[in-house]
């Protein structure tokens, strides 16, 4: 009998349990993801009743209301047992995003020195809830002290190649919040589509967003709603507007700003920079995040070949190669971004282009560890997204679907492979390690056309990402993690999320 057959009855029982539980963790010790830094079991259980109150004042009130709704309770003081959320001083709970959770039979306390910590403590509490035999919700008595390893715990969703709209993103945001991820990067523009309304440039969406003859994009109102929904869950939404390359959709709309082939901005055209400033100014107004990603990757050597105005620019500025021209363009764009009060992010090709040290570098080229080492040595802050561990368009098992890129030939990008990755190289000095802001997985969608397929590729690898991003550095046991993971997969599926169970026959759920 296959593993699927052996586990089917167990999975069915879990499914029935999760269908009636806000969020369950039924293993002992609790099957928490990500695993906390410190846990200590106490005596007894806390029983949730209709008289249980969820209390939080001031900055704690929003999380108290969120938690009360998740548990089917009413926020505020009641005449029964209580769940208290308190903001305390740094000396009591030190560290940004840290929390202390204490569950006793008559009271639950979540304490943190900032609102984010309270929110993450609430997420851990939700995972501790289970159903007792009499149908009531119970939580084991426990004391947890916890804080994240990395401050950047992200997921990139490519909505340019294939469009995924507000309903799809809100579901992803909910699950990111549940697992303490805090950055959603939206790849909004590429060859296939421009997906954000920009007032004053209607052709960006009228022409650049066409799918089967119909424009598919986010209105500014839709995007503001997504950004606020994420912010309410302590998730920062970072926009990516690709340039100079990966810009075919914008070139179809406004070819006068681009090279002759129509795939990259013309760095010699002053009006192109006016266009960029206008567009990025609007983007900066929509997204309050302090970061703006401008791409800066995969520019071909011949992209500006034979363009007389670019040749003149090279002569005037002393630029000899395509890399030199790209570096010139990048410096101009970084200047625009910084003038808007934002900090620029870019892919790791910008290390080769000698981008200003204020740029945050996102390393993705797993075959170029030398670039990562150079970026660390040169003083850049870093977000790590190596393709061979964190590209969620890569296949998860032998024979399964996935992007057919050259870098996808090192075997399946399984849960085990994700977990095996240690983000910070041993060669990094303490100072260099401190400049690693965190990690970010990338769900590219060239070959992902439906929401069910997208979910299949993201889940449950997203939970392995959360484990690496949050838990302290140290060895990770894939078998132990898989034991904790099992009930979470069933919880996701009970909510309608098409999480992969680990068997190839689950592929039927992509298309059904």
What is the role of each PLM region?
Residues 13-22:
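Bacterial N-terminal signal peptides
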Residues 92-291, 307, 332, 336, ...:
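Feature activates predominantly on carbohydrate-active enzymes
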Residues 23-27:
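Sec/Tat signal peptide C-region and signal peptidase I cleavage site
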Residues 2-14:
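Bacterial N-terminal signal peptides that target proteins for export
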Residues 28-152, 453, 461, 469-497, ...:
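Contiguous, structured surface segment used for ligand recognition
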Residues 255-358, 365-368, 372-374:
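Active-site neighborhood of glycoside hydrolase catalytic domains
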Residues 344-349, 354-359, 365-512:
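Flexible, acidic glycine-rich loops studded with aromatic residues
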Residues 62, 163-165, 191-197, 244-250, ...:
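Flexible loop/turn segments at secondary-structure boundaries
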